[in-house]
Amino acid sequence: MASESDTEEFYDAPEDVHLGTGYPVGSPGKVGLLSFKEAENTANQAGNESPVQELRQDVSKKIIESIIEESQKVLQLEDDSLDSKGKGLSDEATAGPSVAGTEFSNIPGLLAIEHELQQDSEKAESQNVAEESELETQKCFPSDETCEKSEKTVDETDNLTEVSSGEQLDASGLEAETLNKEALEVKEGDVLDPASLDTLSTTDFAAVEEVAPAKPPRHLTPEPDIVASTKKPVPARPPPPTNFPPPRPPPPSRPAPPPRKKKSELEFEALKTPDLDVPKENITSDSLLTTNMASENTVRDSLPSLDLASATSGDKIVTAQENGKAPDVQTVAGEVMGPQRPRSNSGRELTDEEILASVMIKNLDTGEEIPLSLAEEKLPTGINPLTLHIMRRTKEYVSNDATQSDDEEKLQSQQTDTDGGRLKQKTTQLKKFLGKSVKRAKHLAEEYGERAINKVKSVRDEVFHTDQDDPSSSDDEGMPYTRPVKFKAAHGFKGPYDFDQIKVVQDLSGEHMGAVWTMKFSHCGRLLASAGQDNIVRIWALKNAFDYFNNMRMKYNTEGRVSPSPSQESLSSSKSDTDMGVCSGTDEDPDDKNAPFRQRPFCKYKGHTADLLDLSWSKNYFLLSSSMDKTVRLWHISRRECLCCFQHIDFVTAIAFHPRDDRYFLSGSLDGKLRLWNIPDKKVALWNEVDGQTKLITAANFCQNGKYAVIGTYDGRCIFYDTEHLKYHTQIHVRSTRGRNKVGRKITGIEPLPGENKILVTSNDSRIRLYDLRDLSLSMKYKGYVNSSSQIKASFSHDFTYLVSGSEDKYVYIWSTYHDLSKFTSVRRDRNDFWEGIKAHNAVVTSAIFAPNPSLMLSLDVQSEKLEGIDKYEDAEVLDSTSTGIVKTDNTEVLLSADFTGAIKVFINKRKTVS
């Protein structure tokens, strides 16, 4: 068992090594005289007078002679008394001042003197600590022969005593210091010479107790042992038994901590302005994404991609386990069992009405508090369930007044009708009633002919206040029974216009039951995915590409063939009515020659249990869908079942495939965590958490070709992370400098602008902003549309010339990405108020996108000539050939929009050529 002195020895070892080299190795006589002078000085300070001093002077020479004689006798002793030597060695470890010689009659006197000196040293420790240390140090070196014998004796008995490791007399200072500390552990009255004690037998100790010679005078030494002098004498430990194991070595020294950075360096790093334009050499090649991927992205084969084998292997349901750590039991129980229903004080479960009535929502404008059960009637029209859920979480009330302008110019009035507000209020109910009548009349139009059509038009014009002389409100010849497009432009925008001749070529209404929250085109532009409130993902295929995708589906989905070990959810999904799109293209209405899509979905994917919020396509036709059921599901166009389900802790608001490696995808959730998933490994590769008071991720995407991951938050922040390690890089606070919107509002969409290091950010302050990532500056602000509470997001056209967005005022808004200075004499280069509006819906336009390849959606006559070889394609890479480059098709744009009722409209616009 280690004592206090052993613990101190470990920490003091470095000092002993340093001090041990300074001991002088002199002659035995010189060392002895110095020790006696030290004893004399100490005795004089303690008050010991002349009787003791005379006795010391008479005995000093005898002690020196006895030491020399004893050293000669040591060599002749036999090893017949090992036990007595072991005991003597244990006592030697606790010995005090040296006493040697064969005249044992003087030893009792010396013991008495040393006892007084020990008491005096405790009273005046600060005066004689140096003297005692030198005396104890020199006692270990009485003569050369004695030292050699002492070392030999220690080596023989090191397995019998705990202190044997400290008795090996070495010239180095470490062994000397160890011996000095052990020598301080003295039993009171036991003062034995460590050098001569090795030669004493058991019968010698009785004689030692009878003799008490006077202690010779000591001399001061100029080099005291400072470390040993600081040790106070403690009671000696009893000798260990014979079979006691050797002592354990001291523990290794602790490693030094890394050097801390200076305060000035930390302040300098904090003041550095982050820049997103980091050279590619900074990315290591042994990490998740290598640098050479960016240089080889033109070669499709060199890029890693996701295949069906890796997507279907492993678990079908993956939980959000960050870095291999399983979530806690409460989290797993919450995901499996769902949230627990609140209970009353008596233990009864509350009903839905009671729960809604217990939640209060405050109107920040009026200060009025209303229960959530009544708030739905007073909420803005077209509010989506995600916004309603966030309002419950944040206890906020979204006001229509939040769309007011924060700039010097006021927003143009959102009233699109020419009559006053009173007249509009009176005709609101009439619109709803006559809207149904218009639909009935359209179905009867074929029977009653042109007269019925004219009557329907007159009723429609009366309800919607359209001008019959307006060319934009007239029906198109090739599109019978399609409601025309109403066009408008900004007040100060006098033309020429680019979208005043836009036409509706197809109406895909009737499939979605409820609002359509998101729409996404595949990279090739031949498939459209739409999803929303009815929990179903629908895939729409172009007419001229239907045969190709149908053959692909039939190839992988023969009779009874599905993915290996499908989950229960995928089994129910595989039973969905995906075979409804197997019918050939001849079943389509022959009158809809200008319609680019088949009127019925190519397939439907069922499996989600709540509203779908976002979609994402990969280059090889994998599709991700995120939902308010806290899951992300993976699909493939050739399969009918769900390939994998990635579970989250909260609503998944945004997802995005990695643009260069579709084995990974990004997901943002309302739990405040950004996750980078590895699809083949079925786990979370990297993750990070948003800091701040409001940890709600509402948008997410990649920028700079996957170099950075960027997310949008509920409080108006765009936070950038490097994709390689998903570490924080920088952030932008999306807000106005003054006015109502100086506080950041919810980010609803983030779109990169390739080739220019810019991103397009949509927010709930009815603004769209274009930021330059090189210096995080605002390049352009677009306004004119209304987006106060919806998840509406803006997107670019196929050639990035225009951007489009839906709006809560039932219009589709289009802006030029940059100002055409030939149209304007004086205009702010960082403001774009010159929008063009299109109205073709009767409800909030929740989504609006441009087609990535408009050349595929021209009339069937032209397409049959350009794409007659589509059935000869062997793989999907050929279909993607046109998506790699920008196709300029004689100023033609294809636009799609969806609304709150589930209607989907397809527009084609042919711009006027300026000669």
Curated annotation (Swiss-Prot):
Residues 235-258 have a biased composition (Pro residues). Residues 114-139 form a coiled coil. This is WD repeat-containing protein 44. The keyword Coiled coil applies. Pfam families: WD40. The gene is Wdr44. The FFAT-like motif is important for interaction with VAPA or VAPB. Its main location: cytoplasm. WD repeats lie at residues 511-550, 607-645, 647-687, 692-731, 742-781, 786-825, 840-880, 882-915. It comes from Mus musculus (Mouse).
